[in-house]
Amino acid sequence: MSNQQTHVRKPDWLKTRINTNKSYRNLKKLMRDNRLNTVCEEARCPNLHECWSERKTATFMILGDTCTRGCRFCAVKTGLPNELDWGEPERVADSVTVMGLKHVVVTAVARDDLNDGGAAVFAETVRAIRRKNPGCTIEILPSDMKGDYESLHTLMDSGPDIFNHNIETVRRLTKRVRARAMYDRSLELLRRVKEIAPNTPTKSSIMVGLGEEKDEIIQAMDDLLAHNVDIVTLGQYLQPTKKHLEVVRYYHPDEFEELKNIALEKGFSHCESGPLVRSSYHADEQVSNAAAQRRIKYMKGVEKQENSQLDFNF
């Protein structure tokens, strides 16, 4: 593809309006008052309204707001992070309670400055959520922690309901897209999760539109399946700023549907695939049956409680 063709106009199916009404502002205030970050906000996710209000799910970003890596697709700021905040786990758990979430995703910036990659705080966050919200299902989305499997054990000992780690792109493009990560290291991390916790669903995500070929996407699916990954999500890469990688191509919704069919035929237990799909999209549907039943019982109790003083209805 020539340089003149790289500046592709965004198609109509990607043009969405971000909801910034009173309820959104209240939620944002809750996050700031508790000194918390969400990927939903950082990435200006187009699905924020649906997840926070309708599906009662949210994705918290812990370990600060500064990443030690500088992946060329990601909008999160990079630099030297602050010291660990050991009060963060309880604040996240309290916010889950106030928001009445039924499913929560906990992700984090990469903390290569820490020996354990932040695994101890990550694990304590999961435990704090579980203590205060026993029926809420929990998905974790960590970095590769530089392949430190002791840190992986620390994470898995906290008992998450889903383990998510994204390969992000196909093998050929990994060095350009996420220079300090390794394709095979990510796959091995996912495989080892199944050794530690065979019944925990594993999940990964692929962005398209960075210059990959269809056969490379299919090969990435095969690689994930070979490492016992259960769930895959596929979404369109969108350039956060002009400093980030340009979009090479926008995939049509029909192409995403085709990729979903391929993924399911290959044996993934669940696949979300669409232009606006992100790693945590419809994450509440992807937990195991046992975890889902625990959540159903919990939510029945939540619905009987009085509404919070904050208005979270959109």
From Swiss-Prot:
GO terms for molecular function: 4 iron, 4 sulfur cluster binding; lipoate synthase activity; metal ion binding. [4Fe-4S] cluster 1 binds at C40, C45, C51, S280. Its main location: cytoplasm. [4Fe-4S] cluster 2 binds at C67, C71, C74. Keywords: 4Fe-4S, Cytoplasm, Iron, Iron-sulfur, Metal-binding, S-adenosyl-L-methionine, Transferase. Its cofactor is [4Fe-4S] cluster. Residues 53-269 form the Radical SAM core domain. SUPFAM superfamilies: Radical SAM enzymes. It catalyses: [[Fe-S] cluster scaffold protein carrying a second [4Fe-4S](2+) cluster] + N(6)-octanoyl-L-lysyl-[protein] + 2 oxidized [2Fe-2S]-[ferredoxin] + 2 S-adenosyl-L-methionine + 4 H(+) = [[Fe-S] cluster scaffold protein] + N(6)-[(R)-dihydrolipoyl]-L-lysyl-[protein] + 4 Fe(3+) + 2 hydrogen sulfide + 2 5'-deoxyadenosine + 2 L-methionine + 2 reduced [2Fe-2S]-[ferredoxin]. It is found in: Cytoplasm. One of its GO terms (cellular component) is cytoplasm. Its EC number is 2.8.1.8. It holds the Pfam family Radical_SAM. It is an enzyme of class 2 (transferase). Transmembrane segments: none annotated. It comes from the Bacteria. Binds 2 [4Fe-4S] clusters per subunit. One cluster is coordinated with 3 cysteines and an exchangeable S-adenosyl-L-methionine. Gene3D superfamilies: Aldolase class I. Pathway: Protein modification; protein lipoylation via endogenous pathway; protein N(6)-(lipoyl)lysine from octanoyl-[acyl-carrier-protein]. PROSITE patterns: RADICAL_SAM. Belongs to the radical SAM superfamily. Lipoyl synthase family. NCBIfam families: lipA, PRK05481.1, PRK12928.1. This is Lipoyl synthase. It comes from Oceanobacillus iheyensis (strain DSM 14371 / CIP 107618 / JCM 11309 / KCTC 3954 / HTE831).
